[in-house]
């Protein structure tokens, strides 16, 4: 059973969040949490919490429908980052000018699902 979690208006630029999201796409959910726990990027912690939230949602749905729940069999089926609204600020510059500062936000969505039995893992070749 698929489970979904999303965070909105996260104060991390989408470009930096996508670097973190690419680390865990397609991995086992428990492995993804371990990778994100030690990733140095600032976006790693919110993404880790989001994956944990999706797993908690999966456990809730499994309990609700009286199904067995094994966290080891869940994988990050889909994860993507969308751009949220941008806050515009101004910084004073020389000779009365103003420089524009863009404070970007992100919307991140995670979908976890049980791994398909018998599916082979594909490796990308260079």
Swiss-Prot record:
Q: Which GO terms describe its biological process?
A: translation
Q: Look up the record and report any one GO term of the cellular component aspect.
A: cytosolic large ribosomal subunit
Gene3D superfamilies, per the entry: Ribosomal protein L22/L17
SUPFAM superfamilies for the chain: Ribosomal protein L22
**A GO molecular-function descriptor:** structural constituent of ribosome
Read off the InterPro entries from this record.
Ribosomal_uL22, Ribosomal_uL22_bac/chlpt-type, Ribosomal_uL22_bac/org-type, Ribosomal_uL22_CS, Ribosomal_uL22_sf
The protein's role, per its UniProt record: This protein binds specifically to 23S rRNA; its binding is stimulated by other ribosomal proteins, e.g. L4, L17, and L20. It is important during the early stages of 50S assembly. It makes multiple contacts with different domains of the 23S rRNA in the assembled 50S subunit and ribosome.
What is stated as this protein's family in its record?
Belongs to the universal ribosomal protein uL22 family.
In terms of HAMAP family, this protein maps to: Ribosomal_uL22_B (MF_01331_B)
Q: What is the name of this protein? A: Large ribosomal subunit protein uL22
Which lineage do the record's taxonomy fields give for this organism?
Answer: Bacteria, Bacillati, Actinomycetota, Actinomycetes, Kineosporiales
């Amino acid at each position: 059973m698929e489970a979904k979690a999303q965070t909105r208006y996260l104060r991390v630029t989408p470009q930096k969040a996508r670097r973190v999201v690419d680390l865990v796409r397609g991995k086992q959910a428990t492995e993804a949490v371990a990778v994100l726990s030690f990733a140095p990027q600032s976006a790693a912690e919110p993404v880790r919490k989001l994956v944990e939230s999706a797993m908690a949602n999966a456990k809730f749905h499994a309990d609700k429908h009286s199904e067995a729940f094994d966290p080891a069999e869940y994988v990050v089926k889909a994860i993507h980052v969308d751009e949220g609204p941008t806050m515009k600020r101004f910084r004073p510059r020389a000779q009365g000018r103003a420089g524009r500062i863009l404070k970007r936000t992100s919307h991140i969505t995670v979908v976890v699902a049980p791994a398909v039995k018998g599916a082979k893992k594909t490796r990308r070749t260079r």
